[in-house]
Amino acid sequence: GLVMRAAHVGAGIAARRGGVSIARLRANMARLTGSEPAEELVVAAVRSHIRNYAEELMLGSRRGAPLAESITFEGFGELVAASVDGPVVLALGHSGSWDRAGAWVCANGRTIVTVAEKVEPRSLFQRFVALREGLGMEVIGVGKGESVFSTLVERVRGRSVIVPLLADRDISGSGIEVDLGTRRALVAAGSAALALK
């Protein structure tokens, strides 16, 4: 549709123009692969990122069959079975459309409890939360340097829920250092710590 075409064209222009975010993307891609990324890969990565935002804008209208047809979720039965005895914690990276996958999980009878970074402006964060809650997810907001671990533990303890958490970047300041690509990186420890509770 029109939104997706506009996102595709706009992302291509943004990637070629550059800027701070694109420079960070290039540096991150180089860290993961050990070499400078080809221009086509940078453009494809920016298009993928912008496509996720465009899809998010359209999520409210994609329920039922259109949503079900847009997702392939291998192993969902095992995930549901595991969540019967308590929360299932998923450590995810910054890739793909988490909200679309979360909406699909909620539409298929499971509750999602997750953490979302408090982005600026506040009104944008509130819109993201409202969208996710409207799709059936429970959202706990967290800002830089904040810890919501005890709140998360209390919210999920003893419940049959799925807890997807982005783990490839730490904003709390209390993450753990790991090898990621060609360098060391500070990642969130919450997923592993929550799984042990």
Model-derived features with residue positions:
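Soluble catalytic domains of membrane acyltransferases
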Residues: 60-197
